[in-house]
Every structure is written in C-alpha cells, then in structure tokens.
A protein has these predicted regions:
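Mid-domain alpha/beta scaffold segments of enzyme catalytic cores
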Residues: 1-262
Length: 262
C-alpha cells in the first residue's frame, strides 16, 4: 500500500516516530507521501522526509484554508523552497513528489475566495513548470475547482479525500485525475461506495489524511497509514474483488501518478 496523503509532520507523530514508521512498513505500507500546507510546514515536511529518504516523499503547497492577508508572502516562501528543492542534484528523495496540498475551500469562510482562486492558479503554474502532479483539496467548491483545473490540461493529480457524487467523479477522471479514497468510505451512511460504481479502479489511490479521518473501526483516533487496509477491504466489496487486487492496483496507480521508484 502507498499512503498518498499523510501529514506525518504533525506534532502528534513526533514522539516515537521511528517505531511508528517501522510498524507501518511491517504492516504493508510501502511509502508515505507528505504534503505541505503553508510556509511554516515547509521546514517540517522536508526535515522529516529527509530523515527517512526512501520511505517519506515530500510535497509543498499552500492549503486554501491558509490563504489569508499574507498569501503573497506565503506563496513566495513556498515557491523559493520548491525551486531550491527541484534544482538539487537528484537523489532518491531530493526532489518533490508533487505540489500540494492546494485547492479551494469555501466551507468555513469565503472572505478570501478570489485570493484562493489566484493562489491555486499560481501553484498550478508551478506544477506546469516542473511537470509535477498536484494534490487537490476541494471542499464546497467543486465547480470552481474543476474549472480552474481545466485551465491547466497538462497538469494531472489526485482529488484528495474524495467524497463527491458519481457525476463529479466522472468529471475528475475524465480530466485525467485520480480519486484519493480514505477513511470516509468506511463511515456509516456514507454514499461514496454508491458513487464509485462504474468508476474504474485504475483511477483510484489510497490515502489517510492522517492524523485525521481514521477509518472504522478506529474513527476518532489518530490515523495510521496501515489502517488503509480497512479502506481497501471496503473497496474490495464495492468492486467485488480481492483485497489483494485492490492493494496491487491502487499501489500501481500511485506509483504511476507520482513517478515513485522504490
């Protein structure tokens, strides 16, 4: 399994991280992708990934909830880090795996709605510049998000923590994007399983959004990458196939999208 979205730089994981990651590896997690969310997370994401250079892979970006008055400064700091990272001599894990976590979020506040749009466009241009995939966050902003993504047809990526309708899922995959499937699939009364019917398994990747969104039966706890197996088990029911087939296919999908060589 590959966890395509895990905030392992969160302080909740600081204590005992060596043992924690050893447990994930032992239970079938091949590697973990670690997105940034703002300028302060740049240092944390890169440092933790550099400590485990063949297991943790970094992404950098400005999360839409963090687009505030200082968004220009935020983007300038993050872009400088992106440029520096991409111009390093390549090693196993020196370069970025993606631009992310980026997108639009209107759930709590739309004060900076237009600034979110411009921040997303700027970061999509970074992805164009470096031929990197993107990790897209979209909450209560589906139409605007998809419209902006369509402005950049050469950029591909994943719709992180997907929980939308079948129609939206179709639009996303028709654009060449993947759907990031996490713990929400296991939640009671979740309609996502119905919405995935007819969506090719070849367009799905697994993720956690850890430390959040732990799947049943661990809902409410600090999430772990190895618990993606519960998501895979639910997907096996949806696609009427073995758990092993789900894991093999989603792992291959993640490796293809993010150009991961293990």
């Amino acid at each position: 399994m590959i966890d395509t979205h895990c905030h392992i730089d969160d302080p909740q994981y600081a204590e005992g991280l060596d043992a924690f990651l050893a447990e994930q590896r032992q239970d079938g997690v091949e590697c973990i992708l670690v997105p940034g969310v703002d300028k302060t997370s740049v240092k944390d994401v890169l440092e933790v990934c550099d400590r485990y250079p063949e297991y943790l892979f970094p992404a950098l970006g400005l999360h839409p909830e963090n687009v505030k008055e200082d968004w220009h400064e935020q983007l300038a700091t993050i872009k400088a880090a992106v440029d520096a990272r991409m111009h390093q001599l390549p090693t196993v894990n020196s370069n970025l795996i993606a631009i992310g976590e980026i997108g639009l979020d209107y759930h709590w506040d739309t004060t900076f709605k237009e600034q979110q749009h411009e921040a997303l466009r700027k970061q999509m241009r970074w992805a164009e510049q470096y031929n990197l995939p993107v990790m897209i966050h979209s909450r209560d902003a589906t139409e605007d998000t998809l419209n902006i993504l369509r402005e950049f047809p050469s950029v591909k990526g994943v719709m992180h923590c997907f929980s939308g309708s079948h129609e939206v899922a179709k639009q996303v995959i028709d654009m060449g994007y993947y759907l990031g499937i996490g713990g929400v699939l296991t939640f009671k009364n979740c309609k996502l399983a119905e919405h995935l019917v007819g969506i090719p398994l070849e367009r799905l990747v697994l993720e956690t959004d850890a430390p959040y969104m732990a799947p049943v039966p661990y809902r409410g706890k600090r999430n772990e990458s190895r618990w993606m197996r519960h998501v895979a088990e639910r997907l096996a029911e949806v696609y009427n196939c073995s758990v092993e087939h789900i894991i093999k296919t989603t792992t291959a999908n993640a490796k293809a999208l993010f150009v991961i060589k293990l």
